[in-house]
């Protein structure tokens, strides 16, 4: 099985700060997806782990994904933001891959167990964050903070 975070060699411009990691792992995160026809969907997620802050790799356990998963399989481009935009005003954009077995599923199981021991993930969505934008209101709203080439 190919490991997503091993696909991206070299230095990543998109690095997650300690504050970003804490926010992503401890807040409700909204994931935006779109079907191949461009029909949008937004869903709230809770079972999240940052796998590699230096390379911008994030895992989300698939516990109840329906439209979100269908969209990711059709169109892997996603956007994330936390419910706490006041303190952590960032939008993260990236590319997602889905795993139903292997190392990532095991990590998703650990994430679920820490949240709610009776949860059992169906799979794991692994996202390589490629862009980070400022969401704080003011003159820099929407400004690109970091982007991988």
From Swiss-Prot:
One Pfam short name: PNPOx_N
InterPro entries the record matches: Pyridox_Oxase_N, Split_barrel_FMN-bd
SUPFAM superfamilies in the record: FMN-binding split barrel
Name assigned to this protein: Uncharacterized protein MJ0282
